[in-house]
Amino acid sequence: MGLNGNGAHARAGRRKVEKVVIRFAGDSGDGMQLTGDRFTSEAALLGNDLATQPNYPAEIRAPQGTLPGVSSFQIQIADYDILTAGDRPDVLVAMNPAALKANLSDLPRGAMVIANSDEFTRRNLAKVGYASNPLETGELSDYIVHSVPMTTLTLGAVESIGATKKDGERAKNMFALGLLSWMYGRPVTTSEAFVREKFARKPEIAEANVLALRAGWNYGETTEAFATTYEVAPAKLEPGEYRQISGNTALAYGLVAAGQLAGTQVVLGSYPITPASDILHELSKYKNFNVLTFQAEDEIAGIGAALGASYGGALGVTSTSGPGVSLKSEFIGLAVMTELPLIVVDVQRGGPSTGLPTKTEQADLLQAMFGRNGESPVAVLAARSPSDCFEVAVEAARIALTYRTPVLLLSDGAIANGSEPWRIPDMGAWADIDPDFTAAGADFAPYARDPQTLARQFAVPGTSGLEHRIGGLEKANGSGDISYHGANHDLMVRLRQAKIDGIAIPDLEVDDPGGDAELLMLGWGSSFGPIGEACRRARRRGVKVAHAQLRYLNPLPANLAEVLRRYPQVVLPEMNLGQLALLLRGKYLVDVQPVTKVAGMAFRADEMEEIIDAALDGTLADRERDKASFARSAAATMGAGQTVSAGQGR
């Protein structure tokens, strides 16, 4: 079989599989994210459906060989439509003992472990608490274990070009990529081209990585250790042109598209923050699409610039994560008072404070809804997947420009860094967005309103004859003059709320194939994939379960009350302590059952399946109470220096 993935293996047997879940794991400096990304690109070229889940520490260079320093990248590829990156890995590539120990509990019996045996030294084993080498003791007997001296083989491969030992060792991730590419029939020619382009200014580094990549492929082809290769056929996707895309990239593309649909400049004022920084980086490439990016000195300056751009007639955008939203809250309030369009992208992460910068969470919902002084309503939307970020960004722009309001667009770390195939849309079929600027010579009052949308009139500064001032003090309805009159303030508060309540949004769609489910699984944001996959599995077992996913969180869909009352049980899993459940219970007086998780990782589909079963057998409420009681009892019984081990408190 050639390096382009064509042909048949002369020695290894070929086995067809519908799907596979692979996890690459090693030190944060071992290149696991790049390795996973390249394997993802190879799978995309073959037409597989795929989903990815990166997981890495917050430190730029975490302590080598330690459990906190482990970086991993999980990908599921399949020959059918999938919704998640998979529950548990079928294959674990462990570059050192820490990677093995950190991920071993996630492996199902019979999974394959491919370990870089060169790194299983006495010192590295001791760092993570191994008294002996698990590759040799038999304690991995539940798994198919391949000990591969990746470092030694890589150094041997690059010896011919005189590469240094340091450069050779850095290329061992390419050896792992080559081996896995051989095993699953992935073409590596595109990865070779990528490496040569990436290191074009350092051809010796490029050559070392290419040689390592080929060495991994050739090792699989020639060794007797791997008796089987695997084939995952292309998925039957809707006709169209596809590309692999991450959530942050899709969101950036959506903002560019929105600017084109509205005929306005997009101005991003932003301060780099994990996990939202890629939006700033990506948008900076599109000056030719009338996009201006401004990397500010802090979060407050970023949103100030964005709001100023909106006042000047552009579409102002700022991107951040939870800590940044806290800092931006006063300017968001100013945008509410001045009734200017503004998009605030919040890529949520673990909190509070600095929290868990590289881990995912959904705990900013109440902050997005209410995190400002006074009655300060804003529209709130949530993306449900990486590719969905494109549509949600365009929709956020439509609402912001049409209704003259700030829009909080919620993503999270799992969506932002995850990737999946995205069918490139035909933008000619999308409706234009009308900013509806007041033209010179028209009747104008800054706070005169459209009777349908309640949006105020807006004249771009400098428009002849329409000079005006706005600011943070309360305005008189119509004229926009400063007003301290109580009755006017009451009117303006209610008008601003009515404007948000009246935003035109579609009804909530419910996936209930038989129309007779007893249980509704309700979600928002990145829970879409795990809930959807769990419902598919449950239905195959004969369980009647419905699924609905909220995109619009403020305002909520008009039919939501009817949907909630239609089902005897409504369960709402969230990566917080029940924030949306709290809102829905209060607004609709429906017994929405919250299911909470704040472990820094997204729900898995198998967890959701357990939640469905627990809801139907009546044990779900007890499970949730157990989580709270475990936290209190753990605090009372754990001594100094102790920590919660993996799996406790779930």
Residues covered by each model-derived region:
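Gly-rich Lys/Arg/Thr-decorated short loops/hinges at beta-loop-alpha junctions or inter-strand turns
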Residues: 19, 156-158, 225-240, 258-265, ...
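Active-site cofactor/cluster-binding pocket
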Residues: 2-262
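Thiamine diphosphate
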Residues: 19-108, 253, 258, 266-267, ...
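Short glycine-rich or small-residue beta-strand-to-loop segments that form or flank ligand, phosphate
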Residues: 20-27, 176-178, 266-269, 316-319, ...
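Short gly/pro/ser/thr-enriched loop/turn and capping motifs at secondary-structure boundaries
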Residues: 57-61, 120-123, 153, 300-302, ...
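Conserved thiamine diphosphate
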Residues: 86, 92, 140-153, 359-412, ...
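Short internal beta-strands
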Residues: 51-53, 112-119, 268, 345-346, ...
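Flexible, low-complexity linker and terminal segments
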Residues: 237, 245-254, 262, 392, ...
